[in-house]
């Protein structure tokens, strides 16, 4: 679609690399991060394979992308890395949040960055915010789009929404 193409062009211009991660995620990876237990993160859709292996449908990709980067970044010279994807997310939402209806399945574009230093991280973050402003300008929403804070239990202080 045209909007996704504009986003893709601006993310690439900012140094992003597009990838696609699996929607089926291993229990072990999320247990290691202490985010598999429903008492900690209660939005998982979980299933079992015939061999009893437990999997979850992706509600986020922090753990899988971190595992991938650990395997492929071999030197600080490889940094910064900005990886993004357009991915179907699945969240077992129980109610609307912040006045906006939350759905159980949606397509989201997310970007993950890996930097050498906090200063470099902040530079990357600023460049991506500028890229989003450019996206909104290009699609004709620049005058009516305002940055907001992506507040929530699983998001870090360096998350933003528009």
Segments from the language model and where they lie:
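TRNA-recognition modules of translation machinery and tRNA-sensing kinases, especially anticodon-binding
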Residues: 1-162
């Amino acid at each position: 679609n045209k909007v996704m193409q504009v986003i893709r062009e601006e993310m690439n211009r900012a140094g992003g690399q597009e990838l696609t991660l699996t929607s089926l995620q291993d229990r072990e990876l999320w247990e290691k991060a202490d985010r598999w237990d429903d008492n900690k993160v209660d939005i998982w859709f979980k299933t079992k394979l015939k061999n009893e292996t437990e999997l979850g449908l992706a509600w986020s990709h922090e753990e899988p992308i971190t595992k991938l980067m650990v395997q492929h970044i071999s030197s600080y010279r490889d940094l910064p890395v900005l990886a993004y994807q357009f991915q179907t997310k699945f969240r077992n939402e129980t109610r609307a949040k912040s006045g906006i209806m939350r759905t159980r399945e949606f397509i989201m574009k997310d970007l993950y960055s890996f930097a050498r230093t906090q200063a470099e991280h902040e530079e990357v973050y600023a460049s991506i915010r500028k890229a989003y402003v450019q996206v909104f300008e290009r699609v004709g929403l620049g005058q009516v789009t305002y940055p907001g804070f992506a507040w929530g239990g699983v998001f870090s202080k360096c998350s933003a929404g528009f």
